[in-house]
């Protein structure tokens, strides 16, 4: 240390001792005019065996205890260098050199954790709501509440505590060391806009050294200081990243970029998710051109306070709008022309139109629910289908009359119809379509999954070329599927009376009628 720097420090030490209380404010303002004082104090702090280190630490503590904001900020600007000096001495296991620095750090910590009344200080913040005006976002159109002092005081939003209450510490231990240092960095970051360029550089150097010491990257950075690894916590790295972000946006691009990379390097090794999240978010938002152009001027972080375009939807989705919302049916059809009526009748009533072409549509399964018996449900289904068909041409009405005489013949072909329905079920697995006749069973009715499982649990081994004209083999029916067989009779009946529609190549349909009397 040069004699000139030593003289500047000694003069500074003697001035404050003889200062009256009324002249403290003027003295705090005049400290900015002493340009050689700050570099000289940095040299004293970096020399662990300097004779001036203990009186300097005592003077800095007196500055902070005075309560003058300017004097407190003057002490805080040396905090990164003080933290590094303490950690390096601790890693070297030489506690005799760090006694005064440790006392200064603990003194600042104990002063900051309490308020003016001596009560524990709790730091908290309020999460803004999109439904209410706020200084954090655009006012939404949900309400027209004026942003007044009374509205902010009675906003009704919960506050989230992010620091405190903290316990007083009399000495550093391995358990509370980084708890104290993290809180001190939090206080430092609260005054970042008042920090000098040398303080921001010291913060970046602290971040790099703490992160790389004892790791292979130390050789890349060519740092020849201590080579032992320093234990860190995720919260400590997050506070370092916060200060680095400010330094990046205020002229320290090179040092800040290296420090951010080093902290992310250490966070990856330690698997700290909080530090990785914050660091990668800041790294992704950086723009080199805008940072370099901000070398001189007002020190601030570049943020967009008032967006130029609206980014909040005016039609906000709330619980009320969700309850009042009704899903549109995917299969809604306008009942206009007779052809559309024919298509609805075939789909809703379970009409199975046999496809004779090679390019036939895949089969369709129609599921419906009813509270009546199985036979009554089949009769209602057939009757409803006939009523739908009466709205067609006169030829179709004649066909319906002729079809009435064929009901007796179909009863003798029940076994063949069951075999054909099994083949249709096998084909329906390729494409399962729930049509407009699907409905949810009411309470007391048979479970849809139970009835469907009874139908689909039958063996699919009997596969025959139904659409090629082959005659299916007869098979005895089980009691579980009697109502399905009766439903299939109605399907086969409508298929039998409508041979003119075979050229349309409609997809075959299976109608499963769910009843509650089983």
From Swiss-Prot:
GO terms for biological process: myelination; phosphatidylinositol phosphate biosynthetic process; protein localization to plasma membrane. Keywords: Cell membrane, Cytoplasm, Membrane. It is found in: Cytoplasm, Cytosol; Cell membrane. The keyword Cytoplasm applies. Its main location: cytoplasm. Residues 385-410, 466-492 are annotated as: Disordered. Component of a complex required to localize phosphatidylinositol 4-kinase (PI4K) to the plasma membrane. The complex acts as a regulator of phosphatidylinositol 4-phosphate (PtdIns(4)P) synthesis. Belongs to the Hyccin family. This is Hyccin. It comes from Danio rerio. The lineage of its organism: Eukaryota, Metazoa, Chordata, Craniata, Vertebrata.
């Amino acid at each position: 240390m040069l004699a000139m720097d030593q003289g500047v420090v000694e003069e500074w030490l003697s001035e404050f001792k003889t200062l009256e209380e009324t002249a403290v404010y003027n003295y705090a303002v005049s400290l900015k005019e002493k340009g050689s004082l700050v570099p000289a104090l940095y040299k004293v702090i970096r020399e662990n065996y300097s004779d001036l280190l203990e009186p300097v630490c005592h003077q800095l503590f007196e500055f902070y205890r005075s309560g003058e904001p300017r004097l407190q900020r003057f002490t805080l600007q040396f905090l990164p260098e003080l933290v590094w000096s303490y950690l390096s001495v601790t890693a070297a296991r030489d506690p005799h050199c760090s006694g005064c620095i440790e006392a200064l750090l603990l003194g600042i910590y104990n002063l900051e954790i309490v308020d003016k009344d001596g009560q524990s200080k709790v730091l908290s913040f309020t999460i803004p709501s999109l439904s209410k005006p706020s200084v954090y976002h655009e006012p939404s159109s949900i309400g027209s509440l004026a942003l007044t002092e009374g509205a902010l005081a009675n906003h009704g939003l919960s506050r989230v505590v992010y620091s405190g209450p903290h316990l007083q510490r009399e000495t550093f231990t391995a358990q509370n060391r980084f708890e104290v240092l993290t809180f001190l960095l939090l206080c430092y970051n609260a005054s970042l806009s008042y920090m000098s360029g040398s303080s921001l550089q010291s913060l970046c150097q602290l971040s790099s050294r703490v992160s790389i010491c004892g790791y292979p990257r130390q050789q890349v950075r060519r740092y020849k200081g201590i080579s032992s690894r320093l234990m860190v916590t995720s919260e400590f790295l997050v506070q370092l990243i916060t200060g680095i972000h400010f330094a990046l946006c205020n002229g320290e691009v090179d040092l800040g970029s290296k420090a951010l990379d080093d902290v992310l390097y250490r966070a990856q090794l330690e698997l700290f998710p909080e530090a990785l999240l914050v660091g990668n978010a800041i790294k992704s938002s950086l723009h080199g051109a805008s940072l370099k152009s901000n070398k001189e001027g007002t020190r601030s972080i570049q943020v967009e306070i008032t967006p130029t375009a609206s980014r909040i939807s005016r039609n906000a989705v709330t619980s009320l709008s969700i309850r009042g919302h009704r899903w549109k049916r995917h299969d809604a059809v306008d009942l206009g022309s007779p052809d559309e009526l024919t298509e609805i009748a075939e789909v809703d009533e379970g009409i199975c139109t046999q496809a004779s072409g090679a390019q036939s549509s895949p089969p369709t399964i129609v599921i419906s629910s009813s509270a009546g018996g199985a036979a009554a449900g089949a009769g209602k289904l057939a009757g409803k289908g006939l009523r739908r068909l009466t709205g067609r041409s006169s030829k179709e009405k004649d066909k319906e009359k002729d079809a009435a005489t064929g009901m007796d013949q179909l009863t003798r072909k029940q076994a063949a119809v069951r075999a054909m329905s099994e083949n249709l079920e096998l084909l329906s697995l390729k494409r399962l379509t729930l049509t407009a006749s699907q409905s949810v069973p009411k309470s007391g009715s048979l479970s849809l999954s139970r009835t469907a499982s009874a139908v689909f649990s039958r063996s699919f081994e009997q596969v025959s070329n139904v659409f090629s004209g082959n005659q299916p083999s007869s098979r005895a029916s089980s009691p579980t599927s009697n109502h399905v067989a009766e439903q299939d009779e109605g399907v086969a009946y409508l298929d039998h009376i409508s041979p003119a529609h075979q050229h349309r190549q409609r997809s075959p349909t299976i109608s499963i009628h769910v009843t509650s009397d089983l």
